[in-house]
Amino acid sequence: MPTQIQNNFRVRKTFAKIAKIIDIPNLINIQKQSYEKFLQADIAADKREDLGLQGVFKSVFPIRDFNETSSLEFVSYHLERPKYDVDECHQRGMTYSAPIKVVVRLVVWDKDEETGAQSIRDVKEQEVYFGEIPLMTQNGTFIINGTERVVVSQLHRSPGAFFDHDKGKSHSSGKLLYNARIIPYRGSWIDFEFDHKDLLYVRIDRRRKLPATVLIRALGAVPDTAKKNPLEFKGSTEEILNYYYATETIYLHSAEEFEKSVELELLPGQRATRDIKAKTGELIVKKNRKFTRAAIKKLEAAKMKTLPIDADELFTKVSAYDVVEETNGVVLLECNEEVTQEKVDELLKHGIKEFKVLFIDNLNVGPYLRETLMLDKLETPEQSIMEIYRRLRPGDPPTPETAINLFTNLFFNPERYDLSKVGRLKLNFKFGLEEPLDGQILTKRDILEVIRYLIDLKNGKGTIDDIDHLGNRRVRAVGELLENQYRIGLVRMERAIKERMSLQEIETLMPHDLINAKPVTAVIKEFFGSSQLSQFMDQTNPLSEVTHKRRLSALGPGGLTRERAGFEVRDVHPTHYGRICPIETPEGPNIGLIASLSTYARVNEFGFVETPYRKVEAGVVTNDVAFYSALEEEKHTIAQANAETDKKGKFANALVSSRRGGEFVQARAEDVDLMDVSPKQLVSVAASLIPFLENDDANRALMGSNMQRQAVPLLRTAAPLVGTGIESIVARDSGVTCVARRDGIVESVDAGRIVVKADVPASLSDVTSEVDIYNLLKYQRSNQNTCLNQKPIISKGDRVMKGDVIADGPATETGELALGQNVVVAFMPWQGYNFEDSILISERILKDDVFTSIHIEEFECIARDTKLGKEEITRDIPNVGEEALKDLDESGIIRIGAEVKPGDVLVGKITPKGETQLSPEEKLLRAIFGEKAGDVRDSSLRVPPGVVGTVINAKVFSRKGVEKDERAKQIESMEEAKLLKDQNDEIKVLQDSAFGRIRGLVRTKEVQGKLVDDKGKILLKKGDILDDELLSTVPYKYWGEISVGDPLDSRLRDILRNLEETKEAVKLAFGEKIARIKKGDELPPGVIKMVKVYVAIKRKLAVGDKMAGRHGNKGVVSRILPEEDMPYLEDGRPVDIVLNPLGVPSRMNIGQILETHLGWAAKGTGEALQRYVEANWSSDAIKERLKVIYSDPAFGEFLDKLDDEEIKQLCLRSKRGIHVATPVFDGAQETEIHALLDEGQLPRSGQMVLFDGRTGEPFDQNVTVGVMYMLKLHHLVDEKIHARSIGPYSLVTQQPLGGKAQFGGQRLGEMEVWAMEAYGAAYTLQEFLTVKSDDVVGRTRMYEAIVKGDNVLESGLPESFNVLLKELQSLALDVELLESAPPERQRSFGGDFLGGGDGEERKTGTEA
């Protein structure tokens, strides 16, 4: 029976108090789902939704020609199988992509000249190749030109309407100027803004501003595009004013006596112009008093219909309509005209007793729009549209048709303007509209409502939008980014198609003649190759991969730029809670612009980030979970995940700490309607891997989560003793481990692959799917040159379940993330070697390879076809001794396993040299002794400085039609053998399974007819009863002829037929792969052969390497001390690392101390358990002890099922310490750490007596000792240090280049020169500034002097001086250099003055 305690079994004691409600969603879903939605590859063409690729095709097609006589329509598309699989693309430097084929239909119309009716003349349908589209791998990455890349999701401003003000900065008075902006997904922006005179203006696409009423009036000239209740709006002044202002009726009794109608909703805040009494004589409001709510109620009760009004008040009012004299139609009072005494008299004269005025009280309602109308001199919609045309196209003479056309195209044409579903959703939400979500263009009501809201803001109603609210920012994931690129490509292609349709004779053309997919593929290539959002994957370790795929960037096309982004955008916002991690963001210029999704967050169909909450009903917490976006969450009161509840889920306290509308409040239990799912939903994956995160300062937690991503995978991995319980999830979702696809039993295991026989119901006659072969990744190079290697962690015969980890990858151990090592640390100063965060380390760590990592470098050698002839890869290299070639094979490529150092030849290569003119003597010698190897030069690939390692692999790629060399053939045959082994294994398992099934069917059955082999030997007699023994005598090839009677016979034939078909399919698939290996490779033009050599470098921990814990506690190794000199414990065990205690208090990352104590307790408990097992082995007693330690009822039940051997195995696993999990914000309390220290028989203080390794004396005070998880970071001293010998110089300044990559020198800057001057080191300084730097002449003289043995320095003129001269001359300054005479000559002139007496010495030269 397989044991329960397999190698991939790991149990953690968890300190969590809060039960798990839902699992963390798959960590790379954001990438995979978005791309699946974009491609819709597995959905039938007729069932695809109009989004992603389908949506793009649908929106660009049909393409009509300019005369509308033909159109090209889109029917469907499908993806074919990719040419190369993922591994082949990696090796060959190809892009992992699939060809896309599109079915298009070309329809040619006949147009009736008289009626204009169209009839179809011809329809041609054809499948057209549409280029390749990159596919996403299983792990959410793309392989572009052989390297893995990730497309980062972009956070951008959501489409919709936004309201804001200028914070009083625009005008000197400090007045708030409000503005509104309608931002579409694509199309023209509309900005509305008030100026300091309170007039309302509009800008279209940030052009010159127009009065807003011009745009409002222009709307009257176009039909409304609303799908639901369209608005009848003709754009007249009356319509405009009555849309925005309420009206009152004025009753004229005489020239001095007026009344107005009572409009109850308009009264609050107004003052009474005189005492107002009811009919009963009761005083309702005194003169000059405001109408209060009580007064309005009294008015209502008294049923008063009118109120008296003073002349002063009446003569500020504005007419709402034209008042017309009925008999002859003369306008007595125009709309928007102020009422005056003259007008009143005129009205009374014509017998008009009542008219309507606008309600403008300058308190709650301002006259802004009315005053803007006064400014606007245009009177009809047509004039307004012409004015807009003039602003947008200055210099173009407008005609009514072109003007209306342009205006319609701006906002009401779906091809030019797209609000997107999100934009429509936001507008509906903001203004309470009911327009359907597919109404993705603006309607009249949208524009009018935006202006209404803006005027309300100005009047003091409503609030401005918070641009950083996550309801106003949305995520564009891969699918959407690619969709936009594809649209750009198709639009470019559309132009070309239109031109072709009109140029050529359409009847003779087929669709493929019109379509050229080059522009589309070019756009896609450019996006993946050079877009800011398509990034080289950070593959340092599994965590960095996962984080990279979950990253959100506010940068990139259509986003912000580093320089322009202010503090608000970068800051943490209340809506980030549970959606975006407040901790994980880079330090430096990108801080806050690049963020990470929180653990439970997901992106909804509109691109808004959602987070899950548990529903609370009547004060009882349920287990129903729903996802809410930032906007949906606004109205709810949300309790924290750690709010206390009783067994029934009721809140234990009357007041619960909650969040409402972004504020923290103490809410009543019955008011709470949602509750957090988990305490870790607040933070990202990297931050949730930090134990005791709650005890760390936020700045250090930020460094901690960033530095975990830089941890180098080590040769020996160890999962942290103190984890947070999320390690296994990260390892599983990152894709670096190998995960079982279905339940089954392990058939065979070796270092390179695992074969699992899956559980398939015995009833099936189909044998196709019974075997799963997992090929493991062996010693591959990652993007960051770390080593990717998988090793199996299960044994033959083990039972595996779907989702189990069956092989560990880099930086994982037993299926858990293992970025570093558990080491014993002591916090104490030691001889100043841990000053300023330095780290003192024991030599044991080097001896045991604790922090050793493997790095793989790839070197490439290319043989090209040059003008002078072909380059050749060969062992025969001119002027190279046999010693240097000892490791090359006959093809000139280094053998695998060779140890190489800088300067060694990896691949021998010779390049033809240009023909040189030979002297007669050389010609003679050549004629006598034959051709000498003088016409080629050595251009071999050599190991660069700083690389010492072992060759682990070599690959040879040859052009088609080029003879393969021995090495290439050898590699080919090895790969072929590997594939054949896979094929044979698969066939063997299939056969075993099929015959096993048949055996089960025919066992105990009676043979119906005798079975004879080819030679006539009887194998089975009629009437034999079949059993395993008898069946084993019959060779497999005769099993198909066994007859046991129907219906079993036909079932038997079915199984065998199915087996044969499956075998054929398997052979075919492997045959294709083998053929691909044998075929020549696709190489860039001009390349004949390419060799890649991989060198593995072992890097032990060295002085200068950077190390860190998980709490932002980083340092550099300062000294590696012999084990015997390290401080040691009472039992003689030395500690591994000594850290500086002064690094803790000021940094406030106390989590590291708690981790150290808990780690010590976990180690001590494991050791105590070991001692207990050795002292008194009794499985029952140990079970009880384990139940006490783990204190988990479910684990207790599991223990009861184990036998003695399994219990022993379980105890053996904990000899280095038991593994514990302390989840973030829900971790171990101090009392629990004390309890575990007691279990491990350790002092509760966590401090021990330490002895000095050099003297054996105890230190004065007890020292904090414990186990900390330390990481070795990617900043390795071996990769940073370098020394320049002969290297390149800059062209302009002639100074050596800088940096290791350029093999540069050390710069001696201004300050260093001052230091040399201060020491008075004149000669050294002269050397530094001339011959060692940029003095070209001096450099050559120096070389000559050294060769001749003169030790004299003759410096020339530094090139930088020449540069200075040229710069001065470029400023038109004539600079002349004077050469001073040598000292002796000066004396001979009697030393009168420098430069000689007769002016002969004054000559201009370039040498000073």
UniProtKB/Swiss-Prot annotation:
Region described as Disordered: 1383-1408
Catalytic reaction equation(s): RNA(n) + a ribonucleoside 5'-triphosphate = RNA(n+1) + diphosphate
EC number, as in UniProt: 2.7.7.6
EC category name: transferase
One BP term from GO: DNA-templated transcription
InterPro entries, per the entry: DNA-dir_RNA_pol_bsu_ext_1_sf, DNA-dir_RNA_pol_bsu_external_1, DNA-dir_RNA_pol_su2, DNA-dir_RNAP_su2_dom, DNA-dir_RNAP_su2_hyb_sf, RNA_pol_bsu_bac, RNA_pol_bsu_CS, RNA_pol_bsu_protrusion
Organism ancestry: Bacteria, Pseudomonadati, Myxococcota, Myxococcia, Myxococcales
SUPFAM superfamilies, per database record: beta and beta-prime subunits of DNA dependent RNA-polymerase
Name of encoding gene: rpoB
Molecular function in Gene Ontology: DNA binding; DNA-directed RNA polymerase activity; ribonucleoside binding
Keywords from the UniProt entry: DNA-directed RNA polymerase, Nucleotidyltransferase, Transcription, Transferase
Protein name: DNA-directed RNA polymerase subunit beta
Organism, as annotated: Myxococcus xanthus (strain DK1622)
Domain of life, source organism: Bacteria
CDD domains given in the database record: RNA_pol_B_RPB2
Entry's family note: Belongs to the RNA polymerase beta chain family.
Described purpose of this protein according to its UniProt entry: DNA-dependent RNA polymerase catalyzes the transcription of DNA into RNA using the four ribonucleoside triphosphates as substrates.
Pfam families cross-referenced by the UniProt entry: RNA_pol_Rpb2_1, RNA_pol_Rpb2_2, RNA_pol_Rpb2_3, RNA_pol_Rpb2_45, RNA_pol_Rpb2_6, RNA_pol_Rpb2_7
Subunit and partners: The RNAP catalytic core consists of 2 alpha, 1 beta, 1 beta' and 1 omega subunit. When a sigma factor is associated with the core the holoenzyme is formed, which can initiate transcription.
Bias-annotated ranges (Basic and acidic residues): 1399-1408
GO CC annotations, alphabetized: DNA-directed RNA polymerase complex
